[in-house]
Curated annotation (Swiss-Prot):
CDD domains xrefs: AAA
Provenance organism: Gemmatimonas aurantiaca (strain DSM 14586 / JCM 11422 / NBRC 100505 / T-27)
Binding site for DNA: R312, R317
Alphabetized UniProt keyword annotations: ATP-binding, Cytoplasm, DNA damage, DNA recombination, DNA repair, DNA-binding, Hydrolase, Nucleotide-binding
Subunit structure and binding partners: Homohexamer. Forms an RuvA(8)-RuvB(12)-Holliday junction (HJ) complex. HJ DNA is sandwiched between 2 RuvA tetramers; dsDNA enters through RuvA and exits via RuvB. An RuvB hexamer assembles on each DNA strand where it exits the tetramer. Each RuvB hexamer is contacted by two RuvA subunits (via domain III) on 2 adjacent RuvB subunits; this complex drives branch migration. In the full resolvosome a probable DNA-RuvA(4)-RuvB(12)-RuvC(2) complex forms which resolves the HJ.
Lineage per the UniProt record: Bacteria, Pseudomonadati, Gemmatimonadota, Gemmatimonadia, Gemmatimonadales
Positions of ATP binding: L22, R23, G64, K67, T68, T69, E130, D131, Y132, R173, Y183, R220
Family: Belongs to the RuvB family.
Gene: ruvB
Keyword ATP-binding found: yes
Protein name as catalogued: Holliday junction branch migration complex subunit RuvB
A Pfam family: AAA_lid_4
Protein backbone atom coordinates (compact mmCIF):
# COMPACT_ATOMS: atom_id res chain seq x y z
CA UNK A 1 0.00 0.00 0.00
CA UNK A 2 1.37 3.41 -0.95
CA UNK A 3 1.27 6.31 1.46
CA UNK A 4 -1.28 8.06 -0.75
CA UNK A 5 -3.58 5.05 -0.36
CA UNK A 6 -3.46 5.19 3.42
CA UNK A 7 -5.93 8.06 3.63
CA UNK A 8 -7.96 7.53 0.47
CA UNK A 9 -11.67 7.07 1.22
CA UNK A 10 -11.97 4.78 -1.79
CA UNK A 11 -12.29 1.08 -0.99
CA UNK A 12 -9.05 -0.88 -1.45
CA UNK A 13 -8.70 -4.62 -1.99
CA UNK A 14 -7.46 -5.15 1.56
CA UNK A 15 -10.48 -3.28 2.97
CA UNK A 16 -13.14 -5.59 1.57
CA UNK A 17 -12.86 -8.58 3.90
CA UNK A 18 -12.22 -6.40 6.95
CA UNK A 19 -15.22 -4.15 6.27
CA UNK A 20 -17.49 -7.18 5.96
CA UNK A 21 -16.37 -8.43 9.38
CA UNK A 22 -16.91 -4.99 10.93
CA UNK A 23 -20.27 -4.26 9.32
CA UNK A 24 -23.10 -3.75 11.86
CA UNK A 25 -25.97 -6.24 11.81
CA UNK A 26 -28.74 -3.82 12.78
CA UNK A 27 -29.47 -0.20 11.94
CA UNK A 28 -29.34 0.67 15.65
CA UNK A 29 -25.68 -0.44 15.68
CA UNK A 30 -24.74 1.95 12.86
CA UNK A 31 -22.60 4.73 14.34
CA UNK A 32 -23.11 8.33 13.23
CA UNK A 33 -25.41 9.98 10.65
CA UNK A 34 -28.11 10.27 13.32
CA UNK A 35 -30.62 12.22 11.21
CA UNK A 36 -30.31 9.75 8.34
CA UNK A 37 -30.74 6.84 10.76
CA UNK A 38 -33.86 8.36 12.30
CA UNK A 39 -35.41 9.04 8.91
CA UNK A 40 -34.64 5.51 7.71
CA UNK A 41 -36.06 3.99 10.88
CA UNK A 42 -39.35 5.81 10.34
CA UNK A 43 -39.48 4.82 6.66
CA UNK A 44 -38.74 1.17 7.44
CA UNK A 45 -41.29 0.99 10.27
CA UNK A 46 -43.95 2.59 8.07
CA UNK A 47 -43.23 0.21 5.19
CA UNK A 48 -43.45 -2.80 7.48
CA UNK A 49 -46.75 -1.60 8.93
CA UNK A 50 -48.23 -1.14 5.45
CA UNK A 51 -46.64 -4.37 4.18
CA UNK A 52 -45.17 -2.45 1.26
CA UNK A 53 -41.65 -2.08 -0.13
CA UNK A 54 -39.75 0.99 1.02
CA UNK A 55 -39.62 3.86 -1.46
CA UNK A 56 -36.58 3.91 -3.69
CA UNK A 57 -33.65 5.49 -1.82
CA UNK A 58 -30.66 7.51 -2.97
CA UNK A 59 -27.58 8.11 -0.80
CA UNK A 60 -24.99 10.66 -1.88
CA UNK A 61 -21.78 11.94 -0.37
CA UNK A 62 -18.02 11.33 -0.40
CA UNK A 63 -16.74 7.73 -0.47
CA UNK A 64 -16.25 5.71 2.70
CA UNK A 65 -19.14 7.13 4.74
CA UNK A 66 -21.41 4.07 4.85
CA UNK A 67 -23.65 4.12 1.78
CA UNK A 68 -23.12 0.44 1.02
CA UNK A 69 -23.48 -0.48 4.68
CA UNK A 70 -26.81 1.32 4.90
CA UNK A 71 -28.12 -0.55 1.86
CA UNK A 72 -27.16 -3.81 3.55
CA UNK A 73 -28.84 -2.75 6.79
CA UNK A 74 -32.06 -1.78 5.02
CA UNK A 75 -32.32 -5.30 3.60
CA UNK A 76 -31.47 -6.84 6.98
CA UNK A 77 -34.06 -4.76 8.83
CA UNK A 78 -36.75 -5.76 6.33
CA UNK A 79 -35.69 -9.40 6.26
CA UNK A 80 -35.32 -9.41 2.47
CA UNK A 81 -32.60 -10.26 -0.02
CA UNK A 82 -29.98 -7.77 -1.20
CA UNK A 83 -28.65 -7.81 -4.76
CA UNK A 84 -25.56 -5.68 -5.36
CA UNK A 85 -24.22 -4.24 -8.61
CA UNK A 86 -22.64 -1.01 -9.83
CA UNK A 87 -23.04 1.50 -12.61
CA UNK A 88 -19.80 0.60 -14.43
CA UNK A 89 -20.72 -3.11 -14.36
CA UNK A 90 -23.95 -2.54 -16.29
CA UNK A 91 -23.06 -2.14 -19.94
CA UNK A 92 -26.42 -2.86 -21.58
CA UNK A 93 -30.07 -3.17 -20.48
CA UNK A 94 -29.83 -6.95 -20.70
CA UNK A 95 -27.37 -6.89 -17.79
CA UNK A 96 -30.25 -5.79 -15.55
CA UNK A 97 -32.77 -8.39 -16.69
CA UNK A 98 -31.46 -11.24 -14.52
CA UNK A 99 -31.14 -9.17 -11.31
CA UNK A 100 -34.57 -7.57 -11.75
CA UNK A 101 -36.43 -10.77 -12.64
CA UNK A 102 -34.85 -12.67 -9.73
CA UNK A 103 -36.08 -10.17 -7.14
CA UNK A 104 -38.83 -11.23 -4.78
CA UNK A 105 -41.47 -8.97 -3.26
CA UNK A 106 -39.76 -6.24 -1.20
CA UNK A 107 -36.18 -7.22 -2.10
CA UNK A 108 -33.48 -4.55 -2.35
CA UNK A 109 -31.39 -3.87 -5.45
CA UNK A 110 -28.32 -1.77 -4.67
CA UNK A 111 -26.55 0.09 -7.48
CA UNK A 112 -23.28 1.69 -6.42
CA UNK A 113 -21.84 4.55 -8.50
CA UNK A 114 -25.27 4.99 -10.00
CA UNK A 115 -24.15 8.24 -11.63
CA UNK A 116 -22.11 6.13 -14.06
CA UNK A 117 -25.13 4.37 -15.57
CA UNK A 118 -25.40 4.70 -19.32
CA UNK A 119 -28.43 6.65 -20.57
CA UNK A 120 -29.96 3.57 -22.20
CA UNK A 121 -29.81 1.70 -18.88
CA UNK A 122 -31.34 4.65 -17.02
CA UNK A 123 -34.28 4.60 -19.41
CA UNK A 124 -34.62 0.85 -18.93
CA UNK A 125 -34.85 1.42 -15.17
CA UNK A 126 -37.63 4.01 -15.34
CA UNK A 127 -40.48 1.56 -15.94
CA UNK A 128 -38.97 -0.88 -13.44
CA UNK A 129 -38.91 1.77 -10.73
CA UNK A 130 -42.32 3.27 -11.47
CA UNK A 131 -44.47 0.46 -12.84
CA UNK A 132 -42.51 -2.65 -11.80
CA UNK A 133 -42.34 -3.65 -15.44
CA UNK A 134 -39.51 -4.12 -17.91
CA UNK A 135 -39.44 -4.45 -21.68
CA UNK A 136 -37.33 -7.39 -22.84
CA UNK A 137 -35.88 -7.21 -26.33
CA UNK A 138 -36.10 -10.61 -28.01
CA UNK A 139 -34.26 -9.99 -31.28
CA UNK A 140 -32.25 -7.46 -33.25
CA UNK A 141 -32.65 -6.10 -36.74
CA UNK A 142 -35.90 -6.07 -38.73
CA UNK A 143 -37.38 -8.85 -36.59
CA UNK A 144 -36.72 -7.02 -33.35
CA UNK A 145 -39.56 -6.90 -30.87
CA UNK A 146 -39.98 -6.28 -27.19
CA UNK A 147 -42.10 -8.15 -24.71
CA UNK A 148 -43.29 -6.48 -21.50
CA UNK A 149 -42.69 -8.42 -18.30
CA UNK A 150 -43.99 -7.64 -14.84
CA UNK A 151 -41.53 -7.88 -11.96
CA UNK A 152 -42.02 -7.98 -8.20
CA UNK A 153 -42.24 -4.73 -6.27
CA UNK A 154 -38.77 -3.92 -5.02
CA UNK A 155 -36.68 -1.13 -3.55
CA UNK A 156 -33.83 0.37 -5.52
CA UNK A 157 -31.06 1.86 -3.40
CA UNK A 158 -28.62 4.02 -5.34
CA UNK A 159 -25.32 5.41 -4.10
CA UNK A 160 -23.29 8.18 -5.67
CA UNK A 161 -20.40 10.50 -4.92
CA UNK A 162 -21.51 12.82 -7.74
CA UNK A 163 -25.16 13.80 -7.28
CA UNK A 164 -24.90 16.48 -9.96
CA UNK A 165 -24.12 13.84 -12.58
CA UNK A 166 -27.48 12.11 -12.12
CA UNK A 167 -30.08 13.11 -14.66
CA UNK A 168 -33.16 14.91 -13.37
CA UNK A 169 -35.55 12.12 -14.48
CA UNK A 170 -33.57 9.52 -12.53
CA UNK A 171 -33.29 11.68 -9.40
CA UNK A 172 -37.03 12.34 -9.50
CA UNK A 173 -37.79 8.63 -9.22
CA UNK A 174 -36.20 8.32 -5.78
CA UNK A 175 -38.72 8.91 -3.02
CA UNK A 176 -36.09 9.24 -0.30
CA UNK A 177 -32.80 11.09 -0.78
CA UNK A 178 -30.15 11.43 1.94
CA UNK A 179 -26.78 13.13 2.02
CA UNK A 180 -24.09 11.48 4.12
CA UNK A 181 -21.62 13.94 5.62
CA UNK A 182 -18.19 13.64 7.18
CA UNK A 183 -18.21 12.22 10.72
CA UNK A 184 -17.27 14.26 13.79
CA UNK A 185 -14.28 13.05 15.80
CA UNK A 186 -16.57 11.85 18.59
CA UNK A 187 -18.33 9.37 16.30
CA UNK A 188 -15.04 8.25 14.79
CA UNK A 189 -13.67 7.54 18.26
CA UNK A 190 -16.58 5.20 18.90
CA UNK A 191 -15.93 3.49 15.57
CA UNK A 192 -12.21 3.12 16.30
CA UNK A 193 -12.90 1.66 19.75
CA UNK A 194 -15.48 -0.76 18.34
CA UNK A 195 -13.13 -1.88 15.58
CA UNK A 196 -10.37 -2.28 18.15
CA UNK A 197 -12.59 -4.61 20.17
CA UNK A 198 -13.44 -6.70 17.12
CA UNK A 199 -9.76 -6.92 16.11
CA UNK A 200 -8.70 -7.48 19.75
CA UNK A 201 -6.41 -4.48 19.82
CA UNK A 202 -5.23 -3.15 23.17
CA UNK A 203 -5.78 0.61 23.02
CA UNK A 204 -6.40 3.44 25.46
CA UNK A 205 -8.81 6.35 24.98
CA UNK A 206 -6.09 8.81 23.95
CA UNK A 207 -4.82 6.42 21.31
CA UNK A 208 -8.31 6.02 19.86
CA UNK A 209 -8.78 9.80 19.84
CA UNK A 210 -5.49 10.38 18.02
CA UNK A 211 -6.44 7.94 15.26
CA UNK A 212 -9.98 9.33 15.01
CA UNK A 213 -8.94 12.96 14.61
CA UNK A 214 -6.59 12.11 11.74
CA UNK A 215 -9.17 10.02 9.87
CA UNK A 216 -10.51 12.75 7.55
CA UNK A 217 -14.02 12.38 8.92
CA UNK A 218 -14.28 8.97 7.24
CA UNK A 219 -14.89 5.61 8.97
CA UNK A 220 -13.12 3.64 6.24
CA UNK A 221 -9.98 5.73 6.74
CA UNK A 222 -10.28 5.38 10.53
CA UNK A 223 -10.38 1.60 10.33
CA UNK A 224 -7.46 1.51 7.89
CA UNK A 225 -5.33 3.79 10.07
CA UNK A 226 -6.14 1.65 13.10
CA UNK A 227 -4.83 -1.45 11.33
CA UNK A 228 -1.60 0.30 10.37
CA UNK A 229 -1.11 1.69 13.88
CA UNK A 230 -1.78 -1.79 15.26
CA UNK A 231 1.06 -3.12 13.09
CA UNK A 232 3.40 -0.46 14.47
CA UNK A 233 2.30 -1.13 18.05
CA UNK A 234 2.85 -4.88 17.75
CA UNK A 235 6.37 -4.43 16.36
CA UNK A 236 7.61 -1.46 18.39
CA UNK A 237 5.34 -0.88 21.38
CA UNK A 238 4.39 -4.23 22.91
CA UNK A 239 1.06 -4.24 21.09
CA UNK A 240 -0.60 -1.40 23.02
CA UNK A 241 -1.84 1.72 21.23
CA UNK A 242 -1.38 4.94 23.20
CA UNK A 243 -1.38 8.52 21.99
CA UNK A 244 2.40 8.46 21.66
CA UNK A 245 2.34 5.21 19.71
CA UNK A 246 -0.39 6.50 17.39
CA UNK A 247 1.49 9.76 16.82
CA UNK A 248 4.70 7.92 15.95
CA UNK A 249 2.98 5.45 13.63
CA UNK A 250 1.00 8.11 11.78
CA UNK A 251 4.04 10.36 11.45
CA UNK A 252 5.81 7.44 9.79
CA UNK A 253 2.90 7.25 7.34
CA UNK A 254 3.04 11.02 6.64
CA UNK A 255 -0.44 11.59 8.07
CA UNK A 256 -0.43 14.88 9.96
CA UNK A 257 -2.63 15.95 12.86
CA UNK A 258 -5.36 17.15 10.49
CA UNK A 259 -5.32 13.91 8.53
CA UNK A 260 -3.61 15.49 5.54
CA UNK A 261 -1.18 13.29 3.63
CA UNK A 262 1.51 13.79 1.00
CA UNK A 263 -0.96 14.17 -1.88
CA UNK A 264 -2.91 16.86 -0.03
CA UNK A 265 0.32 18.73 0.56
CA UNK A 266 1.35 18.43 -3.08
CA UNK A 267 -2.02 19.71 -4.23
CA UNK A 268 -2.03 22.73 -1.93
CA UNK A 269 1.64 23.53 -2.58
CA UNK A 270 1.03 23.43 -6.33
CA UNK A 271 -1.75 26.00 -6.01
CA UNK A 272 0.36 28.24 -3.78
CA UNK A 273 3.76 27.93 -5.46
CA UNK A 274 2.85 27.42 -9.11
CA UNK A 275 -0.37 29.40 -9.40
CA UNK A 276 0.09 32.11 -6.74
CA UNK A 277 -2.68 30.71 -4.59
CA UNK A 278 -5.21 30.44 -7.40
CA UNK A 279 -7.73 30.50 -8.83
CA UNK A 280 -6.64 27.56 -10.97
CA UNK A 281 -8.75 25.19 -13.04
CA UNK A 282 -9.16 21.55 -12.09
CA UNK A 283 -7.52 20.16 -15.24
CA UNK A 284 -4.54 22.51 -14.93
CA UNK A 285 -4.07 21.61 -11.28
CA UNK A 286 -4.31 17.89 -12.07
CA UNK A 287 -1.65 18.20 -14.75
CA UNK A 288 0.63 20.06 -12.34
CA UNK A 289 0.65 17.22 -9.79
CA UNK A 290 0.19 14.29 -12.17
CA UNK A 291 -3.16 13.14 -10.80
CA UNK A 292 -6.48 12.34 -12.45
CA UNK A 293 -8.96 15.27 -12.31
CA UNK A 294 -11.79 12.97 -11.25
CA UNK A 295 -9.74 11.58 -8.36
CA UNK A 296 -8.91 15.08 -7.16
CA UNK A 297 -12.54 16.17 -7.36
CA UNK A 298 -14.05 13.08 -5.73
CA UNK A 299 -11.37 11.93 -3.28
CA UNK A 300 -9.24 14.86 -2.14
CA UNK A 301 -11.21 18.06 -2.61
CA UNK A 302 -14.29 17.33 -0.45
CA UNK A 303 -12.23 17.00 2.72
CA UNK A 304 -9.97 19.95 1.91
CA UNK A 305 -13.00 22.15 1.28
CA UNK A 306 -14.83 20.96 4.40
CA UNK A 307 -11.71 21.39 6.50
CA UNK A 308 -11.09 24.93 5.28
CA UNK A 309 -7.92 24.46 3.22
CA UNK A 310 -9.44 24.97 -0.22
CA UNK A 311 -12.18 27.01 -1.84
CA UNK A 312 -14.02 26.25 -5.04
CA UNK A 313 -14.93 29.40 -6.93
CA UNK A 314 -16.47 30.01 -10.38
CA UNK A 315 -12.97 30.84 -11.64
CA UNK A 316 -11.23 27.81 -10.12
CA UNK A 317 -9.65 26.47 -6.93
CA UNK A 318 -8.14 28.85 -4.38
CA UNK A 319 -5.88 28.02 -1.44
CA UNK A 320 -7.14 29.55 1.81
CA UNK A 321 -5.12 31.43 4.39
CA UNK A 322 -5.34 28.32 6.54
CA UNK A 323 -3.61 26.30 3.82
CA UNK A 324 -0.81 28.88 3.63
CA UNK A 325 -0.23 28.79 7.37
CA UNK A 326 -0.44 25.01 7.61
CA UNK A 327 2.30 24.62 4.99
CA UNK A 328 4.47 27.33 6.54
CA UNK A 329 3.72 30.13 4.07
CA UNK A 330 2.66 33.67 4.90
CA UNK A 331 -0.87 34.27 3.57
CA UNK A 332 -1.06 37.17 1.11
CA UNK A 333 -3.22 40.13 2.03
CA UNK A 334 -6.83 39.39 1.18
CA UNK A 335 -6.32 35.63 0.83
CA UNK A 336 -9.39 33.44 1.31
CA UNK A 337 -10.18 32.66 4.93
CA UNK A 338 -12.35 29.63 5.52
CA UNK A 339 -12.75 28.08 8.98
CA UNK A 340 -12.62 24.31 9.26
CA UNK A 341 -15.63 22.30 10.33
CA UNK A 342 -13.84 19.81 12.60
Amino acid sequence: MSRAEITTPEVLTEDTAVELSLRPQRLAEFIGQSRVKESLTIALDAARARKEPVDHLLFFGPPGLGKTTLADLIARELGVNLTVTSGPALEKPGDLVAPLTSLREGDVLFIDEIHRLRPVIEEFLYSAMEDYRIDIRLADGPNARTVPMNIERFTLVGATTRLGMLTAPLRARFGIVHQLGFYPVEDLEVIVRRTGEVLRVEMDADGAHEIARRSRGTPRVANRLLRRVRDYAEVRANGRITREVAEAALALLDVDHFGLDDMDGRLLRAIIEKFEGGPVGLSTMAAAIGEDPGTIEEVYEPFLVQHGFLQRTPRGRVATARAYRHLGFVPPVGSAEQPGLF
